[in-house]
């Protein structure tokens, strides 16, 4: 059968004769028996191009990939820098924030967003003929707190206007706002590197706030493709403030940082209950570009001229969306202008994950919206005494809190100070300060050196150890789960070296899981108190570790590779009874035995 196949396949016969057969090649195939086992002269048949390539070790592949990625990032940075040098980006932001109120702006209906759809609706909310707006004075208080916290001038007299447009989420055919005479003007927000501004913006950026105005929210739409859309009018007339910044932002990262900072300020003064993550805050960005080497643009906004034609990107619902949408629109406008096109004023949309914005409609202006004073609402009069009282009652601003926590009193890093302020509406910060105060009282008998790092140590335990337990258990913050006094006692025992760090974490976990025994009693009952090793016990452990690794000892002595002492410390801690070997004492004994250096007097 093989001979028949070979007769039908002359190429195969030639291959076998030339590669595998011994003896004269002119001989007959019948006189050349086929080998019964693999022979070193048999060649493997390549069936794919990839198999013939030289094998590259995995480590080398990873290095090559990392190098290529690094080069790609460098090229991207260089391209962005070249673009930044050629084109100037200008961004202004409009932030819509739902106020922390129990009633709607112009009716007594509830603002609860958890009730059944269309259950909190007054006649005016649905624009029933003959219904009139009734301004709810309590809705003004959180708006004033926000404006004061954003350094605005509160206007003693402001007025309401009608902004006309027809859309299914606005039953009246107009929105009540404060276009001509807002209640707050001329504010600002300061941004710093820890807020996330772009490195090109330096150490400080101040973004002006043109105005803050009260206005109604619209109904909530819910689409059911292909053709059904449901409306929940519970949200109609929910009190909003619209915060309009000046066009003084020139970097996408700084635009996102500005929105993030404003949200943090609004939350710190209880002006809002939720942020972007739950839909309580939305942002529109106005984007324009112009060439730096050409004459200033012909457009102006908020008193700032020389700008290019702007476009507006609506309803951005996250900080990342703000940054990505600005980048996408900047790139689109640059591409249009470099190809000889013209930027048109229009409203555009952006979808999460997209790299392009899309046109929604032409940009409406003042004439299109037909602004007019609302004849059913009187002027809004705000007294100086009310503003002064609210100003005095505001909590410490976030920037001042960060400065305090990073100062000499607490000594925290900016990275630890920020989450303490931002987490849990200030409850985490209050808990931390309680822990520090109690801990300082417990440590009054200790020397100044021992007490110096108490606040930093407490910050680590509150944020990372206790915070990590909450995250692992997927539980909301609860200051009573581990009372501040209990955590302070655990840290005190650790600081006095009565327990090890591992034991302290074990005790914290026990209390977190519900153990309510006092800390001293718990330590005694569970036999967790540290029994220090004697000097002889340390020497025995060190000699055992040294005897097992003579080559490493010689490297430390001959080449002065002191970093390897840490490895021996780890070996001693593993060999000794859990929690009893102290790293500092182990290091001292090792230096004495290996280097002949002793810290003993």
Curated annotation (Swiss-Prot):
The protein's annotated catalytic reaction(s) are: L-glutamyl-tRNA(Gln) + L-glutamine + ATP + H2O = L-glutaminyl-tRNA(Gln) + L-glutamate + ADP + phosphate + H(+)
List its EC numbers. Answer: 6.3.5.-
Root EC class: ligase
Cite the GO molecular-function annotations of the record. Answer: ATP binding; glutaminyl-tRNA synthase (glutamine-hydrolyzing) activity
| Keyword Nucleotide-binding belongs to the record | yes
The record ties this protein, via InterPro entries, to: Asn/Gln-tRNA_amidoTrfase_suB/E (IPR017959), Asn/Gln-tRNA_Trfase_suB/E_cat (IPR006075), Asn/Gln_amidotransferase (IPR018027), Asn/Gln_tRNA_amidoTrase-B-like (IPR003789), GatB (IPR004413), GatB_Yqey_C_2 (IPR023168), Gln-tRNA_amidoTrfase_suB_CS (IPR017958), Gln_synth/guanido_kin_cat_dom (IPR014746)
Q: Which GO terms describe its biological process?
A: glutaminyl-tRNAGln biosynthesis via transamidation; mitochondrial translation
Q: Does the keyword Transport apply?
A: no
Keyword list (alphabetical) reads: ATP-binding, Ligase, Mitochondrion, Nucleotide-binding, Protein biosynthesis, Transit peptide
In the record, the note on similarity to other proteins reads:
Belongs to the GatB/GatE family. GatB subfamily.
Please state what the protein is called.
Glutamyl-tRNA(Gln) amidotransferase subunit B, mitochondrial
Q: Please tell me the species this chain comes from.
A: Neosartorya fischeri (strain ATCC 1020 / DSM 3700 / CBS 544.65 / FGSC A1164 / JCM 1740 / NRRL 181 / WB 181)
């Amino acid at each position: 059968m093989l001979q028949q196949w070979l007769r039908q396949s002359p190429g195969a016969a030639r291959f076998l004769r030339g590669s595998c057969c011994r003896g004269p090649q002119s001989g007959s195939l019948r006189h050349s028996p086929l080998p019964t086992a693999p022979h070193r002269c048999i060649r493997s048949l390549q069936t794919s191009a990839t198999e013939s390539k030289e094998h590259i070790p995995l480590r080398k592949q990873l290095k090559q990939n990392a190098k290529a990625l690094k080069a790609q990032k460098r090229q991207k940075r260089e391209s962005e820098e070249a673009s930044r040098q050629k084109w100037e980006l200008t961004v202004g932001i409009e932030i819509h924030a739902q106020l922390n109120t129990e009633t709607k702006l112009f009716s007594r209906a509830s603002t609860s967003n958890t009730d059944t759809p269309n259950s909190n609706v007054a006649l005016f909310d649905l624009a029933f003929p003959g219904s009139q707006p009734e301004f709810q004075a309590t809705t003004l208080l959180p708006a004033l707190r926000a404006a004061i916290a954003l350094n605005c001038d509160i206007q003693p007299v402001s007025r309401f206007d009608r902004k006309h447009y027809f859309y299914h989420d606005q039953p009246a055919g107009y929105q009540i706002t404060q276009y001509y005479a807002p209640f707050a003007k001329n504010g600002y927000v300061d941004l710093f590197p820890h807020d996330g501004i772009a490195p090109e913006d330096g150490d400080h950026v101040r973004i002006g706030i043109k105005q803050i105005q009260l206005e109604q929210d619209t109904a909530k739409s819910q689409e059911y493709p292909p053709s059904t859309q449901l409306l929940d009018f519970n949200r109609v007339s929910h009190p909003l403030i619209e915060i309009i910044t000046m066009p003084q932002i020139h970097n996408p990262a700084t635009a996102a940082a500005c929105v993030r900072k404003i949200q943090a300020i609004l939350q710190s003064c209880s002006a809002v209950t939720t942020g972007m993550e739950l839909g309580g805050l939305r942002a529109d960005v106005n984007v324009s570009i112009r060439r730096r080497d050409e004459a200033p643009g012909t457009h102006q906004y908020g008193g700032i001229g020389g700008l290019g034609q702007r476009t507006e990107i609506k309803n951005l619902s996250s900080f990342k969306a703000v940054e990505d949408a600005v980048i996408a629109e900047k790139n689109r406008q640059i591409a249009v202008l470099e190809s000889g096109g013209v930027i048109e004023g229009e409203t555009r949309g952006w979808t999460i994950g997209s790299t392009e914005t899309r046109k929604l409609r032409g940009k409406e202006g003042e004439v299109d919206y037909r602004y007019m004073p609302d004849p059913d609402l009187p002027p809004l009069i705000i007294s100086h005494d009310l503003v002064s009282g609210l100003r005095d009652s505001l909590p410490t601003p976030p920037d001042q809190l960060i400065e305090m926590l990073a100062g000499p009193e607490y000594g925290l890093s900016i990275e630890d100070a920020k989450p303490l302020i931002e987490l849990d509406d200030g409850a985490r910060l209050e808990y931390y300060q309680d822990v520090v105060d109690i801990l300082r009282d417990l440590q009054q008998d200790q020397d100044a050196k021992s007490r110096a790092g108490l606040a930093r140590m407490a910050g680590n335990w509150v944020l990372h150890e206790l915070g990590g337990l909450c995250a692992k258990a997927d539980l909301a913050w609860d200051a009573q789960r581990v009372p501040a006094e209990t955590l302070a006692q655990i840290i005190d025992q650790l600081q006095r070296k009565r327990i090890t760090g591992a034991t302290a974490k074990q005790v914290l976990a026990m209390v977190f899981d519900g153990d309510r025994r006092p800390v001293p009693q718990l330590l005694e009952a569970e036999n967790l108190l540290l029994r220090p090793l004697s000097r002889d016990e340390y020497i025995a452990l060190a000699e055992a570790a040294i005897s097992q690794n003579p080559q490493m000892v010689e490297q430390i002595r001959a080449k002065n590779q002191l970093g390897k002492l840490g490895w021996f410390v780890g070996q001693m801690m593993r060999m000794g009874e859990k929690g009893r070997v102290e790293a500092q004492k182990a290091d001292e004994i090792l230096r004495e035995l290996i280097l002949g250096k002793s810290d003993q007097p």
